[in-house]
């Protein structure tokens, strides 16, 4: 059938472990979906604030980045490295800069990606990415702090300052892809930024999602 041919799967009535859902509404809307089920407890497999691997994959897919080419991608809030890992798997030939201000996380990423020639790990403040030249990055894709765990961080100020720095390092027409639950703060920062404010009227500017049960949004912007 369609699912078997499209996804190269075999039917297993005893419990194949994969679920496909087809849902319809009375207003005519229909959706065909794959359920990304994880049987193990996520508390045991993920650190606090770590982005789940399947969500990181969806995030990267939504960014619509080329699968091949000598592009430069940056995750300035790389944390545990979920996004850089997916980028290295989905985009062959690119160079990925995974940076974070936390020295401990940077050390763990350096070990995790040891031997991965595509990923370069740096310790850096996302508002001062001094290792990048102006107009040198094709896409910044990141999951910055939302303010849930980092109570000492001024989130509105952080978002404003990071957008200024992203504007500096991105090439003309470069992409900015952000995941955040602090939606009001980010949208206000975009509104106040001369370069990125034009994006707020685009139909794909904002996509609402749930991350571990929390409301968030994925934002797609261009310089």
Residue ranges and their predicted role:
Residues 2-223:
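Class I S-adenosyl-L-methionine-dependent methyltransferase catalytic core
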């Amino acid at each position: 059938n369609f699912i078997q041919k499209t996804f190269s799967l075999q039917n297993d009535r005893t419990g194949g472990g994969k679920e496909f859902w087809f849902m319809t509404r009375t207003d005519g809307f229909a959706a065909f979906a794959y359920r990304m089920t994880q049987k193990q407890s996520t508390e045991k497999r993920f650190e606090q604030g770590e982005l789940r691997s399947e969500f990181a994959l969806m995030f990267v897919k939504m960014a619509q980045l080329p699968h091949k080419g000598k592009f430069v991608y940056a995750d300035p809030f790389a944390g545990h490295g979920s996004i850089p890992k997916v980028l290295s798997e989905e985009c062959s030939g690119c160079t990925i800069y995974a940076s974070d201000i936390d020295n401990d996380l940077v050390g763990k990423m350096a070990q995790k990606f040891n031997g991965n020639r595509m990923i370069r790990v740096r310790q850096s403040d996302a508002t001062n990415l001094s290792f990048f030249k102006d107009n040198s990055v094709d896409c910044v894709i990141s999951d910055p702090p939302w303010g849930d765990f980092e109570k000492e961080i001024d989130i509105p100020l952080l978002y404003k300052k990071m957008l200024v720095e992203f504007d500096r390092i991105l090439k003309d027409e470069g992409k900015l892809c952000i995941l955040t639950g602090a939606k009001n703060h980010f949208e206000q920062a975009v509104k106040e930024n001369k370069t990125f404010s034009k994006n707020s009227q685009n139909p794909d500017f904002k996509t609402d999602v749930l991350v571990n049960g929390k409301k968030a949004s994925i934002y797609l912007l261009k310089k």
